[in-house]
């Protein structure tokens, strides 16, 4: 049951998850293309990485669907870290709204971080996560956005490690 997704959407995701192992040895673009065909979701695809494909739900939120087993782990990691980290760190993490097996729904954030802000604030923010027992792996310009309040927000923290 989902507030954001229809039963058909969830069935489509489950179908993809049952077939994704067939594509484990393909390139990330081939895997993303195959998932898009099998998923047949009505949402616009806005991107993909090695482990997940991202769709715009057109309501201020995005849907991330796993492309690999590691993608499933990334979704679980984002859910766990968002719900178990300190509040002062949570304000720098993209909000998780809903999660299911192989998928996660998060707030859509699309304001790119200007280089001058990134250069000044990214390393201190990485240190803040590290000091709190969270290793911020893969935290770079492609995985951060600016909140409406001007705060750096990590939109992809599936590779973070919580100690």
Where are these regions (language model features)?
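Active-site beta-strand termini and strand-to-loop segments that position acidic
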Residues: 55-59, 108, 147
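Conserved structural core of kinase catalytic domains
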Residues: 67, 83-123
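Catalytic activation segment of kinase domains across protein kinase-like and atypical kinase folds
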Residues: 135-163
């Amino acid at each position: 049951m989902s507030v954001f997704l229809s039963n058909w959407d969830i069935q489509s995701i489950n179908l993809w998850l049952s077939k994704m192992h067939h594509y484990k040895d393909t390139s990330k673009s081939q895997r993303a293309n195959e998932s898009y065909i099998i998923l047949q979701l009505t949402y616009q695809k806005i991107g993909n990485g090695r482990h997940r494909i991202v769709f715009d739900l057109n309501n201020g939120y995005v849907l991330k669907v796993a492309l690999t087993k590691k993608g499933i782990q990334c979704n679980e990691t984002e859910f766990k870290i968002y719900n178990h980290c300190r509040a002062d760190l949570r304000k720098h993490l993209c909000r998780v709204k809903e999660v299911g097996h192989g998928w996660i729904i998060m707030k859509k954030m699309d304001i790119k971080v200007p280089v001058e802000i990134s250069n000044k604030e990214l390393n201190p923010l990485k240190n803040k996560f590290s000091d709190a027992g969270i290793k911020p792996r893969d935290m770079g310009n492609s995985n951060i956005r600016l909140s409406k309040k001007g705060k750096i927000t990590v939109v992809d923290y599936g590779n973070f490690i919580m100690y």
